[in-house]
């Protein structure tokens, strides 16, 4: 039984390739002796197809006014036109028309999409909006401080001067601070005098 199945399998996969497979087999393969004929069919098809797609210039009406029409074109048409230009750019650039060169440059680097120029007056709108929000933030700040508790008693000039005297008596920071010889700084004083009530 095993012998019969092996002979059937061997008959189905014969060592001699069919004509359909022969054109795609390389000469350096294990069946090189059976594939001694040159493979002209395979090599002649691909260059003709790519040459045919890229040798014909794209029509001028298609490329005329592309700067004005590009944003309004559907994405499918944009993709098709770009693919045509991409295939066209694979040939020598001296064979491309001036319209094709301009269109390829504009589609690649033109002011559309994320590179579009901002509309007129946008900078002025941004300035006014920033100024408006800054004024609102100052207003919120002063409203919060209006309803805040009064400053603590330690935030008066008199209290801070008394803190300076205490620091000198206790010789706090005698090297660089208020107790050092020749010290000329303000010490702890940082607030205005207390308001008289």
Swiss-Prot record:
Its keywords, alphabetically, are: Membrane, Mitochondrion, Mitochondrion inner membrane, Oxidoreductase, Transit peptide, Transmembrane, Transmembrane helix
Mitochondrial matrix-side segments: 14-129
Localization terms from the record: Mitochondrion inner membrane
- One Pfam entry for this protein is COX4
GO cellular component term, pick one: respiratory chain complex IV
The protein's organism comes out as: Aspergillus niger
SUPFAM superfamilies, per database record: Mitochondrial cytochrome c oxidase subunit IV
Q: Which GO terms describe its molecular function?
A: oxidoreductase activity
Q: How does it assemble?
A: Component of the cytochrome c oxidase (complex IV, CIV), a multisubunit enzyme composed of a catalytic core of 3 subunits and seevral supernumerary subunits. The complex exists as a monomer or a dimer and forms supercomplexes (SCs) in the inner mitochondrial membrane with ubiquinol-cytochrome c oxidoreductase (cytochrome b-c1 complex, complex III, CIII).
Q: Where is the signal peptide?
A: none
Query: Which stretches are Mitochondrial intermembrane in the membrane topology?
Result: 148-197
Q: What is this protein called?
A: Cytochrome c oxidase polypeptide 5, mitochondrial
Spans traversing the lipid bilayer = 130-147
- As recorded in UniProt, coiled-coil segments are none
Chain's role: Component of the cytochrome c oxidase, the last enzyme in the mitochondrial electron transport chain which drives oxidative phosphorylation. The respiratory chain contains 3 multisubunit complexes succinate dehydrogenase (complex II, CII), ubiquinol-cytochrome c oxidoreductase (cytochrome b-c1 complex, complex III, CIII) and cytochrome c oxidase (complex IV, CIV), that cooperate to transfer electrons derived from NADH and succinate to molecular oxygen, creating an electrochemical gradient over the inner membrane that drives transmembrane transport and the ATP synthase.
Chief subcellular location equals mitochondrion
Q: Which GO terms describe its biological process?
A: mitochondrial electron transport, cytochrome c to oxygen
Q: Which family does it belong to?
A: Belongs to the cytochrome c oxidase IV family.
The pathway is:
Energy metabolism; oxidative phosphorylation
């Amino acid at each position: 039984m095993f012998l019969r199945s092996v002979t059937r399998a061997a008959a189905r996969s014969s060592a001699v390739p069919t004509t359909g497979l022969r054109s795609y087999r390389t000469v350096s393969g294990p069946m090189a002796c059976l594939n001694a004929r040159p493979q002209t069919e395979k090599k002649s098809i691909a260059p003709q197809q790519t040459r045919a797609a890229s040798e014909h210039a794209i029509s001028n009406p298609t490329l005329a006014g592309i700067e004005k029409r590009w944003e309004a074109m559907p994405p499918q048409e944009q993709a098709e036109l770009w693919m045509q230009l991409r295939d066209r750019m694979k040939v020598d650039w001296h064979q491309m028309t001036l319209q094709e060169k301009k269109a390829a440059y504009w589609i690649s680097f033109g002011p559309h999409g994320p590179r579009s120029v901002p509309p007129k007056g946008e900078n002025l709108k941004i300035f006014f909006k920033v100024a408006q929000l800054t004024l609102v933030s100052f207003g919120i700040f002063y409203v919060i401080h209006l309803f805040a508790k009064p400053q603590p008693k330690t935030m008066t000039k008199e209290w801070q001067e008394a803190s300076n005297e205490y620091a000198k008596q206790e010789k706090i920071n005698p090297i660089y601070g208020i107790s050092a010889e020749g010290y000329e700084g303000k010490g702890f004083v940082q607030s205005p005098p207390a308001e008289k009530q």
